[in-house]
From Swiss-Prot:
Protein name: Cathepsin E-B
GO biological process assignments: antigen processing and presentation of exogenous peptide antigen via MHC class II; proteolysis
Post-translational modification: Glycosylated. Contains high mannose-type oligosaccharide.
Tissue expression summary: Expressed predominantly in the anterior and posterior adult stomach and at much lower levels in the larval foregut.
Domain Peptidase A1, residue spans: 74-385
Cellular localization per UniProt: Endosome
Glycosylated residue positions: N86, N130
Origin species: Xenopus laevis (African clawed frog)
Coiled-coil annotated residue ranges, if any: none
Assigned keywords, A-Z: Aspartyl protease, Disulfide bond, Endosome, Glycoprotein, Hydrolase, Protease, Signal, Zymogen
InterPro entries in the record: Aspartic_peptidase_A1, Aspartic_peptidase_AS, Aspartic_peptidase_N, PEPTIDASE_A1, Peptidase_aspartic_dom_sf
Amino acid sequence: MRQILVLLLFVTLVYGLIRVPLKRQKSIRKTPKEKGKLSHVWTQQGIDMVQYTDSCNNDQAPSEPLINYMDVQYFGEISIGTPPQNFTVIFDTGSSNLWVPSVYCISPACAQHNRFQPQLSSTYESNGNNFSLQYGTGSLSGVIGIDSVTVEGILVQNQQFGESVSEPGSTFVDASFDGILGLGYPSIAVGGCTPVFDNMIAQNLVELPMFSVYMSRDPNSPVGGELVFGGFDASRFSGQLNWVPVTNQGYWQIQLDNIQINGEVVFCSGGCQAIVDTGTSMITGPSSDIVQLQSIIGASAANGDYEVDCTVLNKMPTMTFTINGIGYQMTPQQYTLQDDDGVCSSGFQGLDISPPAGPLWILGDVFIGQYYSVFDRGNNRVGLAPVVPYPPLMNGV
């Protein structure tokens, strides 16, 4: 009888979850790389790939390194307004604002994407404030509006969001997403906006104040994974969740004990800070460490990227990220990316984040694809466990 009750409770929790399917599509980096123009993109954005680094200076306005979004492949759908206007967004735990292009945007990138038309929504209100976000060498700017936002059937009322009227450079022209929905803490939200998930909690729209992310690394799966609001799905991971306290409530920031290569501590020997970030595609770290790491794994700069020989993956070292005393191992097959043309690229990228926020390591999609990640706002902690390979996910299952 006890086993039956436990099973019924599990089924109730699983089917009470709000699931947002994540589609896997071509990344921003993919298109210029296919055209042989990736090096030109880096030059335009002021990113010196020879030095293996991008930088983020906290003395500037709130900043998002543009390189973080270059390889993001996981996107979901939301709608804004009444009647609903649909948008494809990155669900980004590394930022806290929701923004989409405005119909009044004059940038080339906006013309290629869905744009919000406030005059068509009966529930829209103007906030009257402006906002600006720094992306690489340019800034994204616009106005703040208030409207209803729907995420997989969850109706969030009176949500503040950015309507971009100017987007930087030409990089977002090739993006598969229209905008970004931030899932970080309110302290890093620009313009005093309350993040979407905070409003979900305040409006009693979720069972528990947590959400979880599953990302499939199977390139042949048409559905990339899922974002779950209100809890987690234990069928998506093996073993138990290992909980890690959040050390700074801005990003989902945690303590990283050390980083090992083939069992030997090489980086972060005295401990360092890291963030678990669905909006960053790769694993990033201080450029001086990444230069050394790329050399260790045999990656070399080529065609605006860092490539490794696909035929020697079995000879490359194993990486282990030790977090709260638990080792999270990654094989070469897991920390490299293989293109359709058979070229393998390193899953590591240099990124210098200035104090006081940095230096930081960022555990992006390359890491999250191997470890189911739960973001618990109620207890300010992150849960991690090895993913269970799944058949293609079906919407709403």
